[in-house]
């Protein structure tokens, strides 16, 4: 076992195609790009179950959630990364403003020695005092009656006391993380730190100095949190404004992630700390006719995530790994690098480090992803993406190598490829057949929710 510290940096809703290290030339992300140059970069990383909570469940446990588990708390039987590291003598801490993790009963603090929740993101019911702003400045008539109006109102209440950049959420998360490692680096004990920033998740409200991607002449509504669904209610000018806000949020997050990474370097921790940076999913911005996360928008802007792993010894720095990787592979990969592969035997996920070293050429033939409650599913290999739709909607097939933006549905030209990928759904979503040890157990399995 190698006694490396482990730091995971989760940046919620960060689109892979908005990072320079993945080919973007418009959005400025110098700090994450620098980390990428020191890391192994995974080009085809995907969440297997969406969105926020199922992804964290897979990351924290190494267990697949789709089609087994919906958005739900961690269960007491779940063995979490923090519990594993705690048993190995690590000090474990979670620092987050992702309020879904911290709601009472969600149990995502399980196994951590300390748990710091920065309150106030999005619709977190935190501040009740009025915000003093005109809510009409932030919504259009098409948004009346939509739940996002309440989220915006709560967010404005939560942020009414902000004075400067350091009061914005990602800055507060990273400052807490910097304080934590400064205090704990002095202790002769390895640590596991999970830093979970809800930004660049909506609302998109970056500090003014990062708002450089929007049209300076824009005078419309401040659409920091659009409603979910088709883009037919929003003008092209407004859509470009929203995209600009998101880009500014990404650069803001990159800046404060950079401050945190600088603190790690300043403390001399780079040589004995494994660093993982990733997102849970991306975010649609009208790329395929809808905005925000919806269960039917199973395209790369939502599905493809950034994932990079920096080895303390600088091994394989700058290497790009193309084979398919899932979020349930992340914990097994970390444990494998630490020489703890035996701890992963009961996990669904597999170590992606074997792809890096050349011990394996692939971990799986396809990834299957979607929302637990939805009948829309996406099956992908390294070249193709097949989307299964419920009747009467038409299925879709995209040749990713020739059409990376998924604009041309070629299912009529390649029906055999669509059928090849579709068959994986039949295997993957076949009802589970529990091992029956006795008549009593057969009855109990059939009459309990876990056995249905």
Role assignments for model-derived ranges:
Residues 1-452:
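Catalytic domains that recognize anionic headgroups
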């Amino acid at each position: 076992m190698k006694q490396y510290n482990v730091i995971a940096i989760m940046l919620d809703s960060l689109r892979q195609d908005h990072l320079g290290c993945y080919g973007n030339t418009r959005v400025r992300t110098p700090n994450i790009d620098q980390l990428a140059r020191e890391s192994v970069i995974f080009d085809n990383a995907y969440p297997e179950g969406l969105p926020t909570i199922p992804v964290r469940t897979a990351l924290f446990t190494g267990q697949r959630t789709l089609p087994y588990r919906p958005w739900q708390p961690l269960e007491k039987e779940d063995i979490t990364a923090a519990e594993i590291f705690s048993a190995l003598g690590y000090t474990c801490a979670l620092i987050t403003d992702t309020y879904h993790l911290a709601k009472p009963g969600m149990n995502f603090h399980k196994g951590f020695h300390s748990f710091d929740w920065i309150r106030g993101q999005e619709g977190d019911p935190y501040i009740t005092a009025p915000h003093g702003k005109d809510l009409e400045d932030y919504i259009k008539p098409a948004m009346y009656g939509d739940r996002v109006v309440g989220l915006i109102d709560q967010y404005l209440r939560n942020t009414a006391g902000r004075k400067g950049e350091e009061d914005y959420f990602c800055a507060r998360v990273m400052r807490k993380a910097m304080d934590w490692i400064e205090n704990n680096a002095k202790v002769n004990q390895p640590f596991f730190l999970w830093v979970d920033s809800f930004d660049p998740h909506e609302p998109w409200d970056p500090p003014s100095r990062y708002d450089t991607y929007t049209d300076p002449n824009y005078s419309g509504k401040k659409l920091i949190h659009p409603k979910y669904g088709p883009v037919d209610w929003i003008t092209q000018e407004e859509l470009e404004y929203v995209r600009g806000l998101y880009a500014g949020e990404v650069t803001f997050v990159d800046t404060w992630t950079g401050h945190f990474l600088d603190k790690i370097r300043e403390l001399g921790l780079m040589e004995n700390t494994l660093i993982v940076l990733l997102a849970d999913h991306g975010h649609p911005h009208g790329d395929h006719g809808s905005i925000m996360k919806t269960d039917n928008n199973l395209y790369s802007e939502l599905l493809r995530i950034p994932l990079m792993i920096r080895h303390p010894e600088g091994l394989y720095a700058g290497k790009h790994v193309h084979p398919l990787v899932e979020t349930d592979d992340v914990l097994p990969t970390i444990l494998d690098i630490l020489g703890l592969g035996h701890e992963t035997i009961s996990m669904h996920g597999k170590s992606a480090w074997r792809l890096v070293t050349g011990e394996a050429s692939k971990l799986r033939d396809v990834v299957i992803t979607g929302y637990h409650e939805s009948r829309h599913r996406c099956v992908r290999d390294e070249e193709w993406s097949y989307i299964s739709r419920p009747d009467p909607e038409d299925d879709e097939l995209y040749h990713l190598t020739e059409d990376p933006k998924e604009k041309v549905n070629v299912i009529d030209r390649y029906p055999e490829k669509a059928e090849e990928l579709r068959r994986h759904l039949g295997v993957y979503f076949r009802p589970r057949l529990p091992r029956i040890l006795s008549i009593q157990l057969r009855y109990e399995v059939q009459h309990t929710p876990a056995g249905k």
